[in-house]
Amino acid sequence: MVLTQLRIASRRSQLAMVQTNWVQAELEQAHPGLSISVEAMATQGDKILDVALAKIGDKGLFTKELEAQMLIGRADIAVHSLKDLPTNLPEGLMLGCVTEREDPADALVVNQKNAEHQLDTLPEGAIVGTSSLRRLAQLRHHYPHLVFKDVRGNVITRLEKLDAGNYDCLILAAAGLTRLGFGDRIHQLIPSEISLHAVGQGALGIECVEGHPEVLEVIKALEHKPTAQRCLAERALLRELEGGCQVPIGVNSRIEANELLLTGMVASLDGKRLIRDQQRGPIDRCEAIGKELAETLKSQGAGEILAEIFAAVRPEA
């Protein structure tokens, strides 16, 4: 069966639409004659801006509404920032494609007052804006003299708050800034020795309905195998730790020759306890490598740390 029409579900935020429009353009180029439409919508995570993400809960915070459209037959695929896509998907849906990864690093963005500073030179009491518990925990571990403040809203709103003086700096994903045309605002790429990135950060995940090989065949044109292999290991680690998108679990992955090197981290919210380790193995065992590293981290106390965090940030009723 040759697919002639494809319906995409997308978040309607500016970054999400930039990403979805890129996917649409790439698919149209790969499949001339394919008619593609986009339905944009707000998700729960887009609507609730006055509560910290971890307090809302992270079960499909930015994905559930898109998945509902596929499950009722109103969309064929959904485009996600892969870091927002839970590791356990609803029955009947699958991760069909992972695109080539942009730089997954976290980035320091400063206002004019702090233009001369790097992360290491920010003065005591400097206010750092982040909505990520992962970034918060790692930076608290390395920079306990800084003050951390939650920041919500889209990237443009966050930059406006920074430039208005509400924060001295922000920590944002370099990939998102670049895709939105704000690459010039990246003041410093934070080394992985300081901040391991989120699982899947920098890659797009295309989710689709199971049992539709014609859709899978179309979207596989955008698959980047090395990125998919790395993210398979990262997502296996996250799934095995029973973590979610909003907990302080960080990763870094590299492919060297035919081997995958995976680094993982779990930290307490105050940053005082940080467990970090590595696992290496053949690239055809990438999922097993993720699971094995998770077990190693658990043996060092990661499970206890995560249990405390889940209790502390239990979603509000």
UniProtKB/Swiss-Prot annotation:
Q: CDD domains under this entry?
A: PBP2_HuPBGD_like (cd13645)
Known EC number: 2.5.1.61
- Catalytic activity annotation: 4 porphobilinogen + H2O = hydroxymethylbilane + 4 NH4(+)
Q: Does the keyword Transferase apply?
A: yes
Q: Please tell me which top-level EC class this enzyme sits in.
A: transferase
User: Is Transferase found in the keyword set?
Assistant: yes
How, per the record, is the cofactor bound?
A: Binds 1 dipyrromethane group covalently.
Q: Which GO terms describe its cellular component?
A: cytoplasm
Residue numbers bearing the S-(dipyrrolylmethanemethyl)cysteine modification: C245
* Entry cofactors: dipyrromethane
**Pfam families to which the protein is assigned, alphabetical:** Porphobil_deam, Porphobil_deamC
Q: Which GO terms describe its molecular function?
A: hydroxymethylbilane synthase activity
Q: In which pathway does it act?
A: Porphyrin-containing compound metabolism; protoporphyrin-IX biosynthesis; coproporphyrinogen-III from 5-aminolevulinate: step 2/4; Porphyrin-containing compound metabolism; chlorophyll biosynthesis
What keywords is this UniProt entry annotated with? Chlorophyll biosynthesis, Porphyrin biosynthesis, Transferase
Q: Which family does it belong to?
A: Belongs to the HMBS family.
Task: Recite the other comments.
Answer: The porphobilinogen subunits are added to the dipyrromethane group.
PANTHER family for the chain: PORPHOBILINOGEN DEAMINASE
The function of this protein is:
Tetrapolymerization of the monopyrrole PBG into the hydroxymethylbilane pre-uroporphyrinogen in several discrete steps.
Describe the subunit structure.
Monomer.
Supply the name of the protein: Porphobilinogen deaminase
Organism field = Prochlorococcus marinus (strain MIT 9303)
Higher taxonomy: Bacteria, Bacillati, Cyanobacteriota, Cyanophyceae, Synechococcales
**Gene name in the database record:** hemC
